[in-house]
Structures are given as structure tokens and as C-alpha cells.
């Protein structure tokens, strides 16, 4: 399977026919700029390209009234003055003789994409469309939107395929109130929207855009609004919202399909959003969503009005859907005060409805939290006033670190025969090794732990590590004997440092003691998941128990491991599963899959050989980009699991700001 790109050049036909400063930014060049970007990067040719077809009137009727559909159809025969008069009856809308055709194509593209994904023709995809849709309501155009493309896609998925749980993620900078109204009382659709709000002073100026609008009737708790009350929100703020609000709810909801209202006016440089999130942030957000719903993601373009920023952001999303590694994130991973206040308001509003939030831990913030303005000065060299100047934005976009994908995605060096591991296709069996003399030199400090066969294995593992650091292999799995696991991990740490890795994240599970000579200089972040008690040796070395509940395990990953990993910004991740590691198949796969994002996939997983037959296939699939299996029914974290996380967060959040999930008391 692959990635679909649904498009039709006719969607560039509708355009503004009169002077209107509010509407002029929704122009045909938005589509052509995005498509040109995909072509220049060679991404279009890697997709399954589908030519959009018009949605039928019956399909439009899944959301819209017959009278409204007829009214839009009538615009095909109106002259300019009549179109202008009709447009003025709506808020921030213009009609054109080709609007009906274009809007039907946009809706049809969304439906085609759902069909392609749910029939298994592709794994995921993007519908590149205009006009956008998320503001459109049952009987009203609104905010450049004519038909509600994503709402239609959700209704179509429910009606045609019988889906019972659909997640809609709306990261457009405007509130998609049209989607909210349509599914306000529907518990089968979980709608998450973040949006510029500024305490109700930003368009569409609605009280129901605030955090306390949670849905009605049976739909209470299934509308999740995260209002941004300042401009300048950046990468760290968006990540914090995903890690501390969206993903906990999404895992508990367990969707069968993820729809993304992919508006890129929330990206840097956009005159509407005035936000600071750089294009590569959308690659990370996309990859974080790929662990849900079996990876079935249908993204539909919404807003985005700075052409260069829009094109770059679309490319970032598509290359992630295609399976390319995520590029590094720019900037400090420090959420601002206003973002944390918004996150706390959402958690407060949603806690009655979600077990995952009832177990949430919220340490008090330190006074060193940066404001958006302070971070803007560091990122752009000027404050985020109106439109960002080209001479500030273009150099920033040029900084995007687009590493080519390594020729080998996943490699394995194992003491167990390959046939016994049932590895997925495309995984390379590593036969190469570093020189014996070099291996012996690295193993000298642990001579008692390495037998002759262990040295041969270590040589292969060092060869894997070199391949990852040289950009020839994206990630790898290796096996060792139980006796040699800790020593192997220590050797790998030292070799990473010798090869001038700036930061190495070590996630060690089971009976693996921290190396005695492990430096505390900020180059190694050591997290040991073992035992019954949490402990802190320093701000870079600590341990925590392995939770036994699904809720506790998800809180460990989303509330501790990923915030630490993103805050540390490692060059390399070493994931070691030692004796008595305690991980089940699905847990190991999810941990590996989630750790790919912060490090661009550069992971070396070392597994003691007693566990490799059980874990090899699921680990390899996760590292290879396949969606990890479900953890099973959601179960609430125990008080002991919550206490362990609380202990660590309260002591670490002063250094690791992404652990913060709440604003200080008034």
C-alpha cells in the first residue's frame, strides 16, 4: 500500500471577481504552489495520484440541506453583480460561476480518499482541494468554505463502511465551527480543534470556540476545543497540545479512521495565524497520528495563505505519509505560559469525560517559562507582528534539514536464525562486522561479560551502529545474551560519543544498571524503566517502574518519555530490552514507533536473546513504519503508577519544560 494524492486542476477555476481584502487571500495559487512544491521534491510521483470526481447531490446531502445545495448550484448562472450580492449574505465568502463545480470536486476528493484508504488501496493520503470546508454548515457557506469536505468524509465513512469511531484533527488556525456543529451530539466522532481565539476576539468570534464547549447530549466530551489566546505559538506549544491533550484522548477513544482538517495557516509566516510553528512540525504531528487507527489517515487541505510556508508544510506532511524520516525540529522545546494555560483549561473541561485525563499529573510551572514573544525573537529575529517579512521567513525555511532517507530502512543482527524471527519483507539481515581487533578493543572494559560468540555479535552490532550514524541505515535491531546486554549498551554509548554524537537517549528496560562511569554532562539522557520505585540520580539519569495498565503505560510514553525525548533532541536513540524487561509485543512496538519521531527514526534496539523470538517481528514492523498493534482495552493507571510519574515530573519539569502540563495557581 502507499499514499494517495487526490487533486483536479479544475479546482483552481474559482476566484474572487471583485475587490475584497478579506477574501482575496483564498486564491488559486494556493493549490498550484502546494502542487509545485510536491513536484519539485519528487513527492507527487511517489504517490498514487487520483483525479478528483464531483460528489453527487446525494452525497452532499449527507451534511447539507437540499435548499442550500440548490442555492449553490444556482450560482453557475449568476452574473458578477448577482454573485457579489449573494456572497454578501454570508460571512467571508465569495461565489464564482465555477464555485459549484469546484466545491463538488473538493467534496468528492475527500470521499475518494476515504474510499481509497478504507478499501485498502492505499494506507493514507492527502486531498489537495479548494474551496476549503471546515467552516461550512448545513445550510450556510462560511469563511471561504462552501461544502464541508471533512464532515462529508466522516459521514461517508460511517454510512458506507459502518465505522463507529472517527477522529477529526483540525489543526487549521481558525476554529472549524462547521464540523463542530455537525457532530455536536455525535459520540462516534471525536473532534479536536486548536485555533487562534484570543479570548473570543479573533474570527469567528464564537463563545462555542472556547474550551468549555464540549458537545451536547450523547456527544458531551467528544468536542475538544483548544483555544490559543496569544499569537506566536510554536513547535513546542503544538507538541505539548498533542502529548498532553489530543493523544491521551485519541488512544482512549481508539479511532478506526483519522481525518485531518489540514489547514496550514497555523504555520509560520501566515498572515491569518501569525503563529511560529515551522513546516517540519507538521511532519512530527503527522507521524504521531500514524500510530492510531492502523495508520489510516485521510488529510484534506483547509487553509494556508502564505504560499511558501503552505507548500513547505504540505511537503512535510506528504513525505511523512510516504514513510520518510522526520526532520529535526527547530527551536527550544519550551511551551509558553499562554499555551499551558490553554492546555490546562481543556484538561479541566474534558476531565469529567475521559479516564486518561482523570489520571493526569500536572506539576506547577517554574517561573522561567518563556513567552511566545521571547521565543519569536530567537526564532525570527523580530516579533510576530502582522505578516512575517520574506527576508526573515525565507532563511528560516532554508534551514529545514531534509536528510535523504537512508537506502536501508531496517536491519537486524541476530544470534537467532532469521527464519525463526518471522521478519517483515524488506528487513536486511546484517552479516557485516567491524574488525575483530576493533571489537576486542571496545569490549576490553567488559571482558568478563563477553564470551567469544558475544564478541562476534558485538562486531555486527557496532557495524549496525556505524551504518545508522553514517546515514546508510535508518534503524536496526540486534540481539545479545542476557549476560552481555548491559555491557553491549555501555559500549554502544561510548562509541556514539567517540563518533561525536552530541546527544544520545538511552531507554533501558529491565535489569540493566546504569554504567558507573556514565557522564552527567548532558550528552547522555539515561532512562531506566524497571523496579517498583521511581528514582532520580540527576537531571539526565533517572528510573521509573514499568506500568502494568494500559493507561499507565500510555502516560509513561506520552507524559514522560516523549516530552523528555523531544526536549533532549537526541542524535541517536538506544533502546535496550534486558533481562526481566516485562514488555509485551504491543508495548514494545508502540514504544519503538513513538521514539522514531524525535530522532528521525535513528534507533538501535538491543534485545536479549530470550525475548527476540517473541518481539522481533512487532519491533521490526514498528521501526519499519507499520502501525503497532493495539494495547487492548483502556484501563486506568493505578495510584502507584500515577505517584511514580508525579514524583519524576515534579522534580524534572524545571529542566524539561515539555513535562509541564498546567499553569501555576493564581
Curated annotation (Swiss-Prot):
One of its GO terms (molecular function) is deacetylase activity. It comes from the Eukaryota. It catalyses: N(8)-acetylspermidine + H2O = spermidine + acetate; N-acetylputrescine + H2O = putrescine + acetate; N-acetylcadaverine + H2O = cadaverine + acetate; N(6)-acetyl-L-lysyl-[protein] + H2O = L-lysyl-[protein] + acetate. Gene3D superfamilies: Histone deacetylase domain. GO terms for cellular component: cytosol; histone deacetylase complex. GO terms for biological process: DNA repair; homologous recombination; macroautophagy; negative regulation of transcription by RNA polymerase II; polyamine deacetylation; positive regulation of mismatch repair; spermidine deacetylation. It is an enzyme of class 3 (hydrolase). It is found in: Cytoplasm; Nucleus. Residues 1-323 are annotated as: Histone deacetylase. widely expressed. Its EC number is 3.5.1.48, 3.5.1.62. The active site is at residue 135. Coiled coil: none annotated. Keywords: Autophagy, Cytoplasm, DNA damage, DNA recombination, DNA repair, Hydrolase, Metal-binding, Nucleus, Phosphoprotein, Zinc. Belongs to the histone deacetylase family. HD type 2 subfamily. Polyamine deacetylase (PDAC), which acts preferentially on N(8)-acetylspermidine, and also on acetylcadaverine and acetylputrescine. Exhibits attenuated catalytic activity toward N(1),N(8)-diacetylspermidine and very low activity, if any, toward N(1)-acetylspermidine. Histone deacetylase activity has been observed in vitro. Has also been shown to be involved in MSH2 deacetylation. The physiological relevance of protein/histone deacetylase activity is unclear and could be very weak. Interacts with HDAC3. Interacts with HDAC2 and NCOR2/SMRT. Interacts with HSPA8/HSC70. Interacts with MSH2. This is Polyamine deacetylase HDAC10. It comes from Mus musculus (Mouse). The gene is Hdac10.
